[in-house]
């Protein structure tokens, strides 16, 4: 009996010690609130630029999404991102009879939350048409309302009038085929596009890589998320598609300038895609080569980033996990290549 009583008393004491007592009736456990934990994405800067991460294709209940706009900001903060764009459909709003507000309302709600959490929020929208036009995001817009037009050409003209940054979305959707249509090619020739998604949702569009390189636009990787982000990608750092940006400053203007200058990398599912010069600088900042005993051909590589790398040394493949060091032996010179870093469809 004494042992049982002692156990009960110790348990009660532990409970009180672990809790913040509001009064004799209510104990609070704020430390169990997972909302206040941010999964930091530690990525190195490169010379002259600050490295930021973002998602530039996101939906809310104001179009066909499942969550309120401020929830998108909460998700981005928890996932370690720095910037998001709210890009609800202009033409497709199935919740329109239940949700009040004009086409700028989702941005206003998200931007207010962004100020509280330190997340940059970009005003945007998605021009939603069937092929051959396709889906197109207009970012950094002034007003979404006049973007809703009868003809897609009118919407593109309005985007130009508002000095928007324009992105071609999921170019292989919905028919699993990507080839520029005549109208898309004309818009590229007129310099109306600034970026192309090479990753969207759970898909990659490898043929887009060469077009991005040819046209000199930005590589983008975005979630196009509609449901809660954890429902699609799980919980943890580096799981969702994200665009890596090399910015002159940590501001909306800095993000815009980086996209317009095509200083971006696309990342998803352990794979990086981007311009060779940027990818080289970034990889060199992530990985450090150490000779352990060159006479015996023993070396090590340390990965100080939150991203994984796959190193091919001859015929051997080494996984370099985030924040880890690997050792390997190379007694004679061998060709070396990062298996998960691409500068084109078939170029590593």
Please describe what each predicted stretch is.
Residues 2, 20-54, 73, 131-141, ...:
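Charged catalytic cores and adjacent phosphate/nucleic-acid-binding surfaces used
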Residues 2-9:
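Sec-dependent signal peptide recognition
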Residues 7, 60, 87-91, 223, ...:
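Ser/Thr-centric signal marking residues that sit
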Residues 9-18:
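Hydrophobic h-region of N-terminal signal peptides that target proteins for export
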Residues 12-13, 67, 98, 234:
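Alpha-helical transmembrane segments and their juxtamembrane interfaces
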Residues 16-17, 71, 96, 102, ...:
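Hydrophobic alpha-helical segments
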Residues 28-165, 169, 178, 198-199, ...:
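A metal-dependent hydrolase metal-coordination microenvironment
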Residues 171-173:
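Conserved catalytic scaffold of divalent metal-dependent phosphoesterases
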């Amino acid at each position: 009996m004494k042992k049982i009583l002692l156990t009960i008393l110790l348990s009660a004491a532990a409970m009180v010690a672990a809790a913040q007592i509001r009064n004799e009736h209510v104990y609070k456990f704020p430390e169990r609130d997972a909302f206040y934990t941010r999964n930091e994405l530690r990525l190195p800067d490169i010379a002259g630029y600050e490295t930021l991460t973002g998602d530039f294709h996101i939906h809310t209940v104001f179009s066909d999404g499942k969550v309120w706009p401020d929830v998108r900001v909460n998700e981005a903060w928890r996932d370690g991102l720095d910037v998001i764009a709210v890009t609800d459909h202009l033409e497709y709003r199935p919740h329109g009879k239940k949700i009040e507000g004009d086409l700028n309302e989702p941005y206003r709600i998200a931007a207010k939350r962004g100020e509280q959490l330190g997340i940059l929020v970009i005003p945007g929208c998605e021009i939603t048409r069937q092929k051959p036009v396709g889906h197109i995001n207009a970012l950094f817009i002034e007003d979404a309302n006049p973007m809703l037009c009868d003809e897609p050409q009118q919407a593109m003209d309005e985007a130009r009038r508002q000095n928007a940054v324009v992105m071609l979305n999921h170019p292989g959707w919905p028919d699993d085929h990507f080839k520029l249509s005549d109208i898309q090619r004309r818009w590229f020739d007129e310099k109306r596009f600034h970026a192309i998604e090479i990753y969207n949702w759970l898909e990659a569009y490898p043929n887009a890589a060469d077009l991005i390189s040819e046209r000199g636009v930005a590589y983008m990787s975005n979630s196009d998320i509609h449901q809660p982000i954890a429902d699609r990608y799980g919980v943890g750092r580096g799981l969702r598609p994200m665009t890596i940006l090399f910015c002159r400053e940590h501001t909306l203007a800095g993000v815009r300038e980086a996209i317009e200058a095509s200083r971006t990398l696309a990342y998803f599912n352990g794979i990086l895609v981007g311009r060779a010069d940027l990818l080289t600088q970034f990889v060199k900042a992530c990985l450090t080569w150490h000779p352990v005993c060159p006479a015996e051909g023993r070396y090590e590589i340390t990965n100080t980033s939150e991203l994984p790398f796959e190193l091919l040394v001859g015929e051997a493949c080494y996984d370099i996990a985030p924040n880890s060091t690997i050792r390997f032996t190379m007694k004679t010179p061998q060709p070396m290549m990062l298996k998960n870093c691409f500068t084109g469809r078939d170029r590593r």
